Structure formats: C-alpha cells, structure tokens
Amino acid sequence: MKVRASVKKRSAECIIVRRKGRLYVINKKNPRFKQRQG
C-alpha cells in the first residue's frame, strides 16, 4: 500500500473507492498498484 498525495489509476483494472473519507485504489489482478490518499 502506497500512501500518496494524489492517487490515479495505473491500469484498467484499478478501482477508486472512498472509505472513511479516504480515497483508495484497489486492484485485484495486480495488488502492487494499491494506493491510499493522505
């Protein structure tokens, strides 16, 4: 999980989700693309 100031999709499979006021990028196929904003 990378924590970044700005999150963006790195592949077509990435999904942007908002949980508890934070933006997350999750990717089932390639989990190394996981990111969190903050």
Swiss-Prot record:
Superkingdom field: Bacteria
TM helices/strands, residue ranges: none
UniProt entry tagged with the keyword Ribonucleoprotein: yes
Keywords from the named record: Ribonucleoprotein, Ribosomal protein
Keyword Acetylation found: no
GO biological process: translation
GO MF annotations in UniProt: structural constituent of ribosome
Similarity comment: Belongs to the bacterial ribosomal protein bL36 family.
Protein name (Swiss-Prot/TrEMBL): Large ribosomal subunit protein bL36
Protein's organism: Flavobacterium johnsoniae (strain ATCC 17061 / DSM 2064 / JCM 8514 / BCRC 14874 / CCUG 350202 / NBRC 14942 / NCIMB 11054 / UW101)
Gene: rpmJ
